A protein has these predicted regions:
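Surface-exposed loop/turn segments flanking beta-strands in extracellular/periplasmic regions
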Residues: 1, 42-58, 101-129
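Outer-membrane beta-barrel transmembrane strands
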Residues: 1-43, 60-80, 88, 130-152
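Glycine-rich, aromatic-flanked loop segments that form ligand/cofactor-binding clefts
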Residues: 92-99
Length: 152
């Protein structure tokens, strides 16, 4: 076995909401949608393989976490006029936030041996470490008006 790899994704999603009927044909709905994702990637390529022997074995460990959420506030209004006319209006206000964290550790030229691979990534003599964080936010407004005559 020349390669040892672990590649695992975990996700946790939810959608929490409430709907409230209001007077005069109005209805309010709120949605909260969080998402949590974490990712583990570990890879080792053994020095016993002829292609990687010159690197003395090489390993990588990567960890990523993502947390996103969004909130929707929705107001709806429905009204019928006589038997032929129907009007519906929908208004939406949205807010969202996303955060992402990533750390990568790599190494090669293991001494005296690369037998522990990514389990002892510090045993290599050519380390490389990097990290990246991302933060984003957004908001939105939307409106929709619908008219129907005789349900057409």
């Amino acid at each position: 076995m020349y390669r040892d790899r672990r590649d695992i994704h975990h996700d946790l999603n939810a959608n929490l909401y409430a709907i409230v009927k209001l007077p005069f044909g109005f209805e309010y709905q709120m949605n909260f949608t969080p998402r949590y994702h974490w990712y583990e990637y570990m890879n080792h390529e053994s020095a016993e393989h002829p292609e990687w022997a010159g690197d003395g074995g090489r390993s990588e460990r990567k960890n990523e976490k993502t947390f996103n959420w969004q909130v929707d506030n929705i107001l709806r209004w429905k009204k019928e006029f006589g038997e032929d006319h129907r009007v519906e209006a929908t208004f939406l206000q949205n807010a969202e936030k996303g955060q992402w964290w990533k750390t990568v550790a790599q190494n090669k030229l293991y001494s005296p041996s690369d037998i522990l691979g990514f389990h002892n990534i510090g045993a290599g003599t050519a380390p490389s470490v990097s990290s990246e964080d991302t933060y984003k936010t957004g908001d939105a407004l939307m409106g929709r008006l619908f008219y129907s005559f005789k349900d057409k």
